[in-house]
Amino acid sequence: MLNLVRLFAVVDDIFCLFQGHIENVALLKQQYGLNKTANEVIIVIEAYRTLRDRGPYPADQVVRDIQGKFAFILYDSSSKNAFLASVSNKNVLYSS
């Protein structure tokens, strides 16, 4: 049985609880300009923040480039948006 990591982080009033594993961590770190110590939860926050700051994108855009087995819930307290994704059933829920 695969042991899935559970991580929590807060960056600039964006809260994220992540469980699982991302397979393409190195590629995503490069894509988002993150340092070598960035983990899965930081990658999710940065993907969300990058897309949020670029304009209105569909919520599922955040998870399109992420490969692996994971689920996360993200809350952006500045915009009061919540975002839940689960790769196991390909669902992305977004609440604003």
Predicted features and spans:
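N-terminus-centric sequence/structural signature that marks the extreme N-terminus
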Residues: 1-96
